[in-house]
UniProtKB/Swiss-Prot annotation:
UniProt xrefs under CDD domains: TMEM168
Keywords, alphabetical: Glycoprotein, Membrane, Nucleus, Transmembrane, Transmembrane helix
Membrane topology of this protein: Multi-pass membrane protein
Gene (UniProt): tmem168
Location (main, coarse): nucleus
GO cellular component, one term: nuclear membrane
GO MF assignments: sodium channel regulator activity
Signal peptide limits: none
Function per UniProt: Plays a key role in maintaining the cardiac electrical stability by modulating cell surface expression of SCN5A.
Family the entry assigns: Belongs to the TMEM168 family.
Residues forming coiled coils: none
Source organism of the structure: Xenopus laevis
Glycosylation site residues: 340, 536, 607
Protein name per the record: Transmembrane protein 168
Length: 700
């Protein structure tokens, strides 16, 4: 046995030293962060080996010895696949599956008789250190920009670890094992809920973390190792939990695995949700067999059970109607795909925003009905009921989050105006001057490229174009004043103002950020902001200014002080000193080219945090930027929605949901949430900010 342990330790040390040699070949931040992750895995592996050894040593159970030896063989096979056959995916899959399985064994094998053993204490410390290192590694990876977020529900490693943990529960009786398998499914739903950034995902996570150790495992009456259970929970939840803040994916990007799924799969998911809801209702009805509190249970279940049924009929009709409208959007999307119309733009044109805003209120009532019915029919000794309840909560939370986020990001109209002044030289008084003839052709090509890029940007995101002014001699103040005021006064064909106004400028600027215009005139940020206040008034439109100039930082700093308008400035910062042997000196247009490519090509490989960039991105937003919301549906919209999708018998509940939604019952929570969002935007500005219009603001 000691030989096996020595072999395991020596193999792990060999792996670590091999990794260290690879890191020494190319020492950089990314390899250092990755090495921290390897340390967490090594600590966990040693903890598992020591924990299994202690259990075998104390119980003399040959099953543990067989599993331990088999685990070593599996890890040896994984190492061979990784190092000799370059089958990294297969190797990591085997490791993740066995990590989950062995952690489950540590969790479920009774250790109460030897919990004060010295080696068992060391195992506990190793498990705790693994939690700390894993969490720290995940945090550092995201702070350093080493993680490239991609649309997914569950990663392969998370899925395999969950499967391994569920398989480990089969060492118990069937009913207890089934309860734990359903609990693992609930944890998978919560991971997806967090990754989708659902509005109630954190609250659902807190409920899960509170109920599981205190009530669920107590209902099963089984001894559980809290250290192994905590290690499994924190290691698997740390990445999706941190991604709630660090993920820069837009709403449609996060929900891509569902929104872009085939029609049959989406319909099947709705039917599956309906079956899960029905199973929950059946288990809740088992409470009627408790005659001890019949005078409370029977009336309570009768009232809230009927309320739950009506709410969930509306819930399923809403999901079915959403998929019907989504199918229509996919038909249009497949027809107009060559025109670069994204799916979210098509959904906006099909009226999905109003549908989602109304549906959000109805789904919230369904979630509230589930919580009430769960409380009324609570069964503290039934692990199956608790696990199914914990599955239903994140499912309904995801539906609420989908409608909430789509309702907030879809439907915004936008209009853009671009000014391209291809002058690089200025007179001492600040007036732009024409370039020498030998540079004209080169500059014209570069300026035309900038013009084409910004036109591509407008077309790709279905931004209505007011105009793209290209002037080699510069624009005077009066001309620019007239054009900008006309642009800022534009409205949609239906009458209201556009939701977002985008101004793009590239050309010469002074060190203070002022635009250098013809005749020695300038345009200051305060002047443009005053024009915007004059035209926007009490409306809730946004202004986004994109600058490709040598001195955009002053405007980026000034916009942070704006407290009464929704304004954002995206600028560029050019390196002052560049090694010509390593990279070309930065020029105007380089930022535009990269920024447009980043926002128009989802398969781009642009890394804004890359070390040694000659052109860096900077942006800032005004103080109330995070408070921005689109217009809400009116009572007439709700009535039309009800008449279109729901039977007449459900109208009272639909009307009640609309009335309660208008009451703003959670105004205090929304105020706190608004304050937290403002704090985040003012003090912890994210590296990537989704504007909700299909493009993003970025900073290096």
């Amino acid at each position: 046995m000691c030989r096996s342990l020595r072999y395991c330790v020596s193999h792990c040390l060999y792996t670590a030293m091999t990794r260290l040699e690879e890191a020494n070949r190319e020492v950089n931040m990314y390899s250092s962060v990755r090495y921290l992750g390897y340390l967490a895995q090594l600590s966990l592996l040693v903890a598992i080996c020591m924990g299994l050894y202690v259990r075998w040593d104390q119980t003399d159970d040959s099953f543990i010895l067989v599993i331990f030896i088999l685990g070593l063989v599996i890890f040896a096979i994984a190492s061979i696949l990784y190092y000799y056959f370059s089958m990294e995916a297969a190797s990591l899959s085997l490791c993740n599956l066995w990590f989950g399985f062995l952690l489950g064994l540590l969790c479920f094998i009774d250790s109460s008789t030897f919990q004060h053993d010295l080696k068992e204490e060391a195992t506990k410390y190793l498990l705790v250190s693994s939690i700390i290192i894993k969490t720290l590694s995940a945090l550092v990876e995201r702070i350093c920009g080493c993680v490239r977020h991609r649309p997914t529900l569950l990663t392969s490693s998370e899925f395999l670890e969950l499967v391994g943990f569920a398989i480990a529960s089969t060492i118990m009786l069937m009913q207890k094992s089934l309860s734990i398998i359903l609990l693992v499914a609930a944890l998978a739903m919560i991971i997806i809920d967090l990754r989708m950034k659902s509005f109630l995902s954190i609250a659902i996570l807190v409920v899960f973390a509170s109920l599981t150790p205190e009530l669920f495992f107590r209902s099963l009456d089984i001894p559980v190792n809290p250290y192994a259970l905590s290690c499994f929970f924190f290691c698997i939840i740390s990445n999706p939990f941190l991604d709630v803040y660090f993920s820069g994916l837009s709403v449609t990007e996060r929900w891509k695995p569902y929104l872009y799924r085939g029609r049959f799969c989406r319909r099947f998911s709705v039917i599956s949700i309906g079956l899960i809801e029905l199973v929950f209702f059946v288990f809740a009805a088992l409470k009627l067999g408790d005659l001890h509190l019949w005078y409370f249970v029977i009336p309570g279940f009768s009232i809230f059970g009927i309320f739950w049924l009506i709410c969930h009929i509306i819930f399923l009709i809403t999901l079915w109607g959403f998929n019907t409208k989504l199918n229509e959007c996919h038909k249009v999307y497949s027809t107009h795909r060559p025109d670069n119309n994204s799916l979210d733009r098509v959904m906006a044109s099909k009226g999905m925003r109003h549908f989602c805003l109304i549906s959000e209120r109805l789904v919230f009532f369904s979630l509230l009905a589930t919580i009430i019915l769960g409380a009324v029919s609570w069964q503290s000794s039934n692990g199956l009921f608790i696990s199914i309840f914990l599955i239903v909560l994140p499912l309904e939370s995801m539906a609420h989050g989908l409608f909430h986020e789509l309702g907030n990001c879809l439907g915004g109209t936008s209009i853009g105006y671009a000014v391209v002044i291809p002058t690089n030289f200025c007179s001492p008084n600040g007036q732009p001057m024409l370039l020498p003839p030998e540079h004209v052709e080169e500059l014209n090509l570069r300026s035309t490229g900038m013009l084409n890029s910004i036109q591509r940007f407008f077309a790709s995101h279905m931004i209505e174009t007011y105009g793209c002014d290209y002037s080699t001699s510069g624009l005077n103040f009066d001309t620019l004043h007239s054009k900008l005021k006309s642009f800022l006064d534009l409205r949609t064909s239906d009458g209201p103002r556009h939701d977002t106004y985008i101004i793009y400028y590239t050309g010469h600027s002074h060190s203070t950020g002022e635009w250098a215009l013809a005749g020695g005139e300038t345009l200051r940020f305060e002047t443009l902001l005053e024009w915007w206040r004059e035209k926007n008034g009490s409306f809730c439109s946004r202004l986004i200014i994109v600058l490709d100039t040598e001195s955009s930082q002053p405007w980026v700093k000034e916009v942070r002080r704006v407290g009464d308008q929704y304004v954002a400035v995206q600028g560029a910062e050019m390196a002052r000193v560049v090694d010509i042997e390593e990279a070309d000196p930065p020029q105007l247009g380089d930022f535009t080219k990269e920024w447009v490519e980043y926002n128009c090509n989802p398969d781009n490989n642009i890394n804004w945090t890359e070390k040694g960039r000659t052109v860096k991105a900077v942006y800032a937003v005004s103080k109330p930027w995070s408070d921005y919301t689109l217009h809400l549906p009116t009572g007439n919209d709700v009535t039309k929605h009800w008449m279109t999708y729901f039977p007449h018998i459900t109208y009272p509940l639909v009307h009640l949901a609309n009335w309660c939604g208008a009451l703003n019952m959670f105004w205090l929570c929304k105020i706190c949430y608004k304050c937290l969002k403002r704090l985040k935007m003012n003090w912890f500005l994210p590296a990537v900010l989704d504007t909700g219009q299909g493009f993003k603001l970025v900073k290096s």
